[in-house]
A protein has these predicted regions:
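Basic, short loop/linker segments at the boundary and entry of helix-turn-helix/winged-helix-like folds
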Residues: 15-59, 206
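Short, conserved catalytic/metal-binding motifs centered on acidic residues
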Residues: 28, 58-59, 73, 97, ...
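DNA-recognition alpha helix
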Residues: 69-90
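Catalytic or ion-translocation cores adjacent to nucleophile or general acid/base/metal-coordination motifs
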Residues: 206, 213, 315-316, 322-330, ...
Length: 487
C-alpha cells in the first residue's frame, strides 16, 4: 500500500507580497553588488532597531515601489515597511517606519550623498562600459540624447531647498529642472547616464556643455576635439578684434574732436554773452532804446546762435560718448570671447593628448539647446550634432526662400521638409545642414527647423534625417516615465 504524501518540514515557507516586482529587483541588486556597496556607505547616525544604511536602502526601494510621499512607506494602501519578502530580497532584516527613514535622511551629509552617488556609479559602470563597446562594435558610433525637464513641487511650499519658479509643463511652476543624458543602447534601447538637479528657472541653453561633460565622464569616451576648426575660428576672431579696436580708436578721436568743438562754441558764447552784458550797461547808462538793428540786438542774435549751437554740440558730445562706450564694450566682449576660445583650445589640445582612443559620437538635442554658441561648442568638441532651432527669425527667413514651385519632401505621415546645405546661423561660424519642416495640425500650418553637422549627407535622405532626429523621443518617453511612479 502506497504512503500518502507528507509535508516536508524543511521546505521554504511561501511569503506573500504586494510588491512582487521589488523582489527580483532586490535579488538583482544583491547580484550586482548594489546592496553590499550601499551598506558600506558611512552615515553619521547610531543604529537603533535598523542600521542607517538599511533605511537608505529602504528609501531607494520606496522610490521603486512608487511611493509618492515618504509617509506612504508606512501609511500607503500597501505599507512597504510591513513587507518582509521585499526586505529579505534586499538582504535586510526588515524595514523601519517612515519616520525613522526621515530622521536618517536628515542625518545624511554632503559626504553621505557623494558616497551614495559614487556607490551607484561603481555598480553601474560595468553596464555602461559594456553598452559603449557594443554600440561601437554594432554601429561604430555612440548616440547621446540630452534633455532638460521640469520637476514641479507644491507652489506654496517653502521647504524645498533650491527650488525656483520656472517654465514646466507649459506653465510657470515652482520646482526644479533635471538635466538628463541617455545613451542609445543596443541591449536596453535607452541607458540613463546622468541626471543633475537645477533650480526651476534654469534654461536649456545654459546646460549643453554640462550635458556633454556628464556623458563623457560616465562613458569614459570622447571624440577627437576639432582643434583645427577652433584655431581657425580664433584667427578670424583676432581679425574681428583688431577691427573693433580700430573703430574704438576712431570713436575716441571723434569724442576728442567733439569736445574741442564744444569748448570752442562755449568760448564764443561767453564772449558774446560778455558783449551783450557790456552793451546793456552802456544802453542803460545812456538811456538808449534797443532797436532791431542796433549793436545790442545784433549781439543778442549772435549770442542766441551760439547758445543753440552749444546745445547741439552738447548733444553731439553725448552721442559721441555713447558711441565710444558701445565700441569699448564691443572690444571688451571680443577680448573676453577670444580669451575664452583660447582657453578652450588649450584644453582641447590637452584633451587630444590624453585621448588615445577617440570615438565617433552624435548628440541629439531639442530646440532649447540649439542656439549658435552651443552648436559651435559641440562641433568643436568633436560631436556630430542633430538639433532644432527655435529662432523665429531663422524660421521666417527660410520660409521666405520657399517659392510656390519649390518641392517639399514627405518625411512623415504629417510632415514635409525642404533642406539646404552649407548654411550658417547666428553665433555659429560653421556650415550646417538646415531643413525647414512643415506640419499640418487641423486648419493650422506649423513650421520648425532642423540643424545638422556631421559626416552623414542628410540632405540627400531627408526622411532618414527626420526619423533619426525624432529617435530622441526615447529620452522624452523616459522623462515621462520618470514623472510617473512604478505600480
Amino acid at each position: 500500500m502506497s504512503q500518502l504524501p507528507t509535508e516536508d518540514q524543511n521546505a521554504p515557507t511561501a511569503t506573500l507580497t504586494s510588491h512582487a516586482m521589488l523582489v527580483p529587483w532586490g535579488l538583482f541588486a544583491q547580484h550586482i553588488g548594489l546592496v553590499e556597496t550601499l551598506e558600506g556607505v558611512s552615515i553619521p547616525q547610531r543604529r537603533r532597531e535598523y542600521t542607517p544604511q538599511t533605511k537608505v536602502i529602504e528609501f531607494l526601494v520606496s522610490i521603486l515601489a512608487g511611493c509618492a510621499y515618504l509617509q506612504d512607506i508606512s501609511r500607503g494602501p500597501h505599507p512597504l515597511d510591513q513587507d518582509l519578502a521585499v526586505a529579505q530580497a534586499w538582504k535586510q532584516e526588515g524595514w523601519a517606519d517612515y519616520s525613522g527613514v526621515s530622521r536618517t535622511l536628515k542625518a545624511c551629509t554632503e559626504e553621505t550623498v557623494t558616497s551614495v552617488k559614487e556607490a551607484l556609479e561603481i555598480v553601474s559602470r560595468p553596464f555602461i562600459e559594456r553598452e559603449v563597446m557594443l554600440a561601437l562594435l554594432d554601429r561604430g558610433v555612440l548616440v547621446y540624447d540630452g534633455d532638460l525637464t521640469g520637476r514641479p513641487v507644491s507652489s506654496t511650499s517653502t521647504t524645498y531647498p533650491g527650488a525656483a519658479f520656472g517654465w514646466m509643463s507649459d506653465a510657470v511652476q515652482l520646482g526644479y529642472q533635471a538635466a538628463l543624458v541617455s545613451l542609445h543602447s543596443p541591449t536596453y534601447g535607452r541607458l540613463w547616464l546622468s541626471v543633475e538637479q537645477h533650480p526651476g528657472d534654469t534654461v536649456s541653453s545654459s546646460q549643453a556643455e554640462a550635458l556633454v561633460q556628464a556623458a563623457e565622464a560616465r562613458t569614459g569616451a570622447r571624440p577627437w576635439r576639432r582643434t583645427d576648426l577652433l584655431a581657425e575660428r580664433i584667427t578670424q576672431h583676432r581679425a574681428l578684434l583688431q577691427e573693433a579696436e580700430v573703430k574704438q580708436a576712431s570713436a575716441q578721436a571723434r569724442l576728442k574732436e567733439t569736445r574741442h568743438r564744444l569748448a570752442q562754441v562755449e568760448q564764443e558764447r561767453q564772449m558774446w554773452a560778455q558783449d551783450v552784458a557790456e552793451l546793456e550797461v552802456m544802453y542803460r547808462a545812456r538811456n538808449r532804446p534797443e532797436r532791431p538793428h542796433s549793436r545790442l540786438a545784433q549781439a543778442r542774435r549772435r549770442l542766441a546762435v551760439r547758445e543753440r549751437r552749444l546745445s547741439r554740440r552738447q548733444k553731439d558730445l553725448e552721442r559721441a560718448q555713447r558711441w565710444l562706450e558701445r565700441r569699448q564694450q564691443k572690444v571688451a566682449d571680443q577680448q573676453a570671447e577670444l580669451e575664452q576660445l583660447q582657453q578652450r583650445l588649450d584644453q582641447f589640445i590637452e584633451d587630444n593628448h590624453t585621448n588615445p582612443w577617440p570615438i565617433r559620437a552624435i548628440f541629439r538635442l531639442d530646440g532649447g539647446f540649439g542656439n549658435g554658441p552651443n552648436v559651435a561648442l559641440l562641433i568643436e568638441m568633436g560631436y556630430e550634432v542633430y538639433s532644432k532651432a527655435t529662432n523665429a527669425n531663422l524660421i521666417q527667413d527660410l520660409r521666405r526662400r520657399v517659392l510656390p514651385a519649390t518641392p517639399w519632401v514627405r518625411v512623415g505621415k504629417n510632415a514635409e521638409m525642404i533642406a539646404w546645405e552649407g548654411e550658417t546661423i547666428t553665433n555659429c561660424p560653421y556650415p550646417l545642414d538646415v531643413a525647414l519642416e512643415r506640419f499640418q495640425t487641423g486648419d493650422k500650418e506649423r513650421h520648425g527647423v532642423l540643424l545638422h553637422y556631421g559626416e552623414e549627407r542628410v540632405t540627400a535622405n531627408q526622411a532618414g534625417w527626420f526619423t533619426f532626429y525624432n529617435g530622441r523621443q526615447t529620452i522624452e518617453a523616459g522623462v515621462k516615465e520618470g514623472k510617473n511612479v512604478f505600480q
